[in-house]
Amino acid sequence: MDKKYDFSLSYEALTRVCENAICEHIRRAGSLEGLGFALEYTKAYAILEVWSLLAAAGDTFPALIEKDRIYLLQLISGKNNIEPH
């Protein structure tokens, strides 16, 4: 990583990409047992962690980040009764 590259990604695009990736890992976990099941959920939580770090690094309102964090967490836990922003 000798060269520095800048790129732009909207908060909405970041959230959408992470939401889709989380949903894919949860979908895969549904057909697995044991270690495979646990690994897919671990990947989903890792995506949530990276999303949280990137969202906080941007200039987004903390209340919006918290609402979306809860939404993504509920996707992982299966309690998705909150709509995304």
Locate the predicted segments by residue.
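Short intrinsically disordered terminal tails
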Residues: 1-4, 81-85
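N-terminal acidic leader/helix
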Residues: 2-38
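Long, C-terminal folded domains that constitute the functional core of proteins
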Residues: 10, 21, 71-77, 81
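Short, charge-rich amphipathic interface segments used for partner binding and complex assembly
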Residues: 35-78
